[in-house]
Amino acid sequence: MPHSYDYDAIVIGSGPGGEGAAMGLVKQGARVAVIERYQNVGGGCTHWGTIPSKALRHAVSRIIEFNQNPLYSDHSRLLRSSFADILNHADNVINQQTRMRQGFYERNHCEILQGNARFVDEHTLALDCPDGSVETLTAEKFVIACGSRPYHPTDVDFTHPRIYDSDSILSMHHEPRHVLIYGAGVIGCEYASIFRGMDVKVDLINTRDRLLAFLDQEMSDSLSYHFWNSGVVIRHNEEYEKIEGCDDGVIMHLKSGKKLKADCLLYANGRTGNTDSLALQNIGLETDSRGQLKVNSMYQTAQPHVYAVGDVIGYPSLASAAYDQGRIAAQALVKGEATAHLIEDIPTGIYTIPEISSVGKTEQLLTAMKVPYEVGRAQFKHLARAQIVGMNVGTLKILFHRETKEILGIHCFGERAAEIIHIGQAIMEQKGGGNTIEYFVNTTFNYPTMAEAYRVAALNGLNRLF
């Protein structure tokens, strides 16, 4: 006789991964509950990560755009906004996103339970509710989508009012004149752009030898130059020895012997999975040193009835990929296999000012692979649309095979890069002979548009062939 469970599946976490899994499961007729530890759904992406930081960035970039526009640059009407004002804008966006996502669950009759989940045995969860009570829930299968949080080294005092991580920075109540950012990954670079755009002095401490080393080197160099040109001080190959919080700021002692002082510190060097409270040892699961779980191609953990998606499994740690991982896991959970798979070339969007976005292979990788490729470039400053709106900083680069004309990689630096990249991605994903750079020469683009950069870059690249 089959065992009777409260639910077919329980999803732990309501971020993009949890939402993708829950929606995928209910659409297939499964009885699903979603456990969320906070009062509102959306996870870290909505409340502390993607949404608020991008809302901040947008507000700051619009202020920069206004102040740099020659129509308004008589210095009598320069825009100024406090960090608190800009955070209010982010809060409005968060509230809209929360209401929308709450509606998804309600319309699909997906039960949401608030509390902290922990495993009791292979099919049982204990739910510690906000009122102090404990509920017991059973399910045949589980999806762990509990996300991640900023990594906190034990020798840094995050209780100090001037030491922030990428979550607590959203609660900053003072106006810093000088910010230290430790960690020059995606989060560190994005906040360096935001603070510098608000005319705050920024010291960016990079533990590596160049910014965002996973990017095509030309894009990384473009960002480095843009930071240098805007006044961001970048210190490469540095690690902290000691961090001291004091009444008027923070002092950082570097292993190289340097000392830096600023009004506050943003520590943005890595993230860790939110798995420590799940009591995974009770079901025989182990995490790595950063609290992340290993999964197979169908997002199953070492326990076949337990799946994991999103930040808790590490790379690529993107909201967009997490949602797709959730949908794929839901299909595998119900049917035993998934026909859908995560695409091979996942686009990356980095919301610095200006943006960086890429899809496919870099020049460095193609050179190492000994692939005969060619490069086509378009500078934004040569596009009519960019000249009209004053977006002269930026470039689009297309890498393609010299013989087959197949597009191998696309890299973009400039405003709207994360939108522009998808035009090229759509052609790259075409099967058969559909993936060819000649498409951009043979199609007609609206004029004037930023999309026209593809035609300019394609012609530039094809003209290099002989």
Swiss-Prot record:
EC number(s) on file: 1.6.1.1
Catalytic activity, as annotated: NAD(+) + NADPH = NADH + NADP(+)
Pfam families for this protein: Pyr_redox_2, Pyr_redox_dim
Cell compartments where the protein resides: Cytoplasm
Major place of residence: cytoplasm
Cofactor binding description: Binds 1 FAD per subunit.
Keywords per UniProt: Cytoplasm, FAD, Flavoprotein, NAD, NADP, Oxidoreductase
Keyword Magnesium listed: no
GO cellular component: cytosol
Necessary cofactors: FAD
Residue sites binding FAD per the record: 36-45
Top EC group: oxidoreductase
Keyword Flavoprotein tagged: yes
SUPFAM superfamilies: FAD/NAD(P)-binding domain, FAD/NAD-linked reductases, dimerisation (C-terminal) domain
InterPro entries noted in UniProt: Class-I_Pyr_Nuc-Dis_Oxidored, FAD/NAD-bd_sf, FAD/NAD-binding_dom, FAD/NAD-linked_Rdtase_dimer_sf, Pyr_nuc-diS_OxRdtase, Pyr_nucl-diS_OxRdtase_dimer, STH_gammaproteobact
Record note on quaternary structure: Homooligomer; probable homooctamer.
General function of this protein: Conversion of NADPH, generated by peripheral catabolic pathways, to NADH, which can enter the respiratory chain for energy generation.
PANTHER family: DISULFIDE OXIDOREDUCTASE (PTHR22912), SOLUBLE PYRIDINE NUCLEOTIDE TRANSHYDROGENASE (PTHR22912:SF93)
Family: Belongs to the class-I pyridine nucleotide-disulfide oxidoreductase family.
Protein name, as recorded: Soluble pyridine nucleotide transhydrogenase
Origin species: Escherichia coli O157:H7
Gene label: sthA
